[in-house]
Amino acid sequence: MMNTRSNGRTHNWFGVVGLLIALLLMGSCSYSEEKAIEQSAVSFAQKYFNLHYCQALSECTPESEKWVRLKASNITQEDLDILNTQADSATCTVELVEFDGDSATTIVEVCNFLNCDSIGKPGVICPNAKFKLTLKKIGKQWKVDI
């Protein structure tokens, strides 16, 4: 007669090891996706909030281009003069990343940026604010969707 108890333990052991490997692989994929989303959000925000709008276009979806161009068209020389008096440029950090499939949402804290919220009035330097950015995965890249 054959002892099946040890054979069953072996199968259980391989099952547990297989499950652990699968969980680790899934976790690392999620981590790398989260990092890619975070990098895309920060890259866009750094360019956008430092008024490098042409460079920011490469970080957003084609549908968002018109909104970035509209924002750029409303910047005045007075706004640029205010921005140029600042010793430090705007800085951006991601506080939250949530994603599901090919879409993501981030909360980005932006510090020391020019806030231009009224047409016809000069912008003011804002010490910090939080913004929600939505991103879409296009091919293998994450792009901000305004």
Whereabouts are the PLM-identified features?
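Structured segments of extracytoplasmic/periplasmic soluble domains
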Residues: 43, 47-51, 59-63, 138
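Exposed beta-sheet edge and beta->alpha loop/turn motif
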Residues: 96-146
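Residues embedded in well-ordered secondary-structure elements
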Residues: 18, 83, 122-124
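Short solvent-exposed beta->alpha transition segments
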Residues: 38-39, 53-114
